[in-house]
């Protein structure tokens, strides 16, 4: 597996456990790309859902993907602060087509005051049964929910106070 280069524009593909496409983001600019970490940014990019419907993101977002963790984090810059949407997912993979991951339904929404809510537990239970997630997936995801909430409390990684603003400034250099 290679990794995307700084300044490169890539698609992001989200899949379900059964291999079906879940969602595609048309264009994300890579701000940092290594074997273990990818940081990207997008603004008003086209998103295509599995049923073919499309929509456009409303605000700039910084995307954080790590090869060693079963989650990715999207920091969205809004007028009243940074909101985070965290997807419990497989670690990322990259090929010339796109940056890819498997979405495992559970999400954590983090508000500007760093309070958070675990979302979609019912969807996870349903898909776990339908797609027959192996028991090890449940163990891995529970461990990563704990890891992610620890990062939120500690303001670590993408939740660090200046993380999103710093990477957004870098993104603006590529837009001009």
From Swiss-Prot:
InterPro entries cross-referenced by the UniProt entry: DUF402 (IPR007295), FomD-like_sf (IPR035930), Ntdp-like (IPR050212), SA1684 (IPR016882)
Keywords on record: Hydrolase, Magnesium, Metal-binding
Keyword Nucleotide-binding: no
Chain sites annotated for binding Mg(2+) 2: 105, 107, 120, 123
Domain of life: Bacteria
Top EC category: hydrolase
Main function: Has nucleoside phosphatase activity towards nucleoside triphosphates and nucleoside diphosphates.
Name of the protein in its database record: Nucleoside triphosphate/diphosphate phosphatase
Species annotation: Bacillus cereus (strain ATCC 14579 / DSM 31 / CCUG 7414 / JCM 2152 / NBRC 15305 / NCIMB 9373 / NCTC 2599 / NRRL B-3711)
The organism's taxonomic lineage, starting at the top: Bacteria, Bacillati, Bacillota, Bacilli, Bacillales
């Amino acid at each position: 597996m290679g990794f995307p280069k700084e300044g490169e524009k890539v698609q992001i593909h989200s899949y379900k456990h059964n291999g079906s496409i879940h969602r595609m983001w048309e264009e994300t600019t890579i701000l940092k790309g290594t074997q273990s970490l990818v940081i990207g940014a997008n603004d008003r990019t086209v998103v295509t859902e599995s049923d073919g419907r499309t929509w456009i993101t409303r605000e700039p977002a910084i995307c954080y993907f790590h090869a060693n963790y079963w989650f990715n984090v999207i920091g969205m810059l809004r007028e009243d602060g940074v909101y985070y949407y965290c997807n419990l997912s497989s670690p990322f993979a990259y090929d010339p087509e796109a940056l890819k991951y498997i979405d495992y339904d559970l999400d954590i929404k983090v508000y500007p005051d760093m309070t958070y809510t675990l979302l979609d537990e019912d969807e996870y239970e349903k898909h776990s049964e339908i797609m027959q997630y192996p028991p090890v997936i449940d163990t891995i995801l529970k461990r990563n929910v704990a890891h992610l909430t620890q990062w939120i409390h500690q303001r670590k990684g993408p939740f660090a106070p200046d993380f999103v603003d710093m990477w957004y400034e870098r993104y603006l250099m590529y837009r001009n």
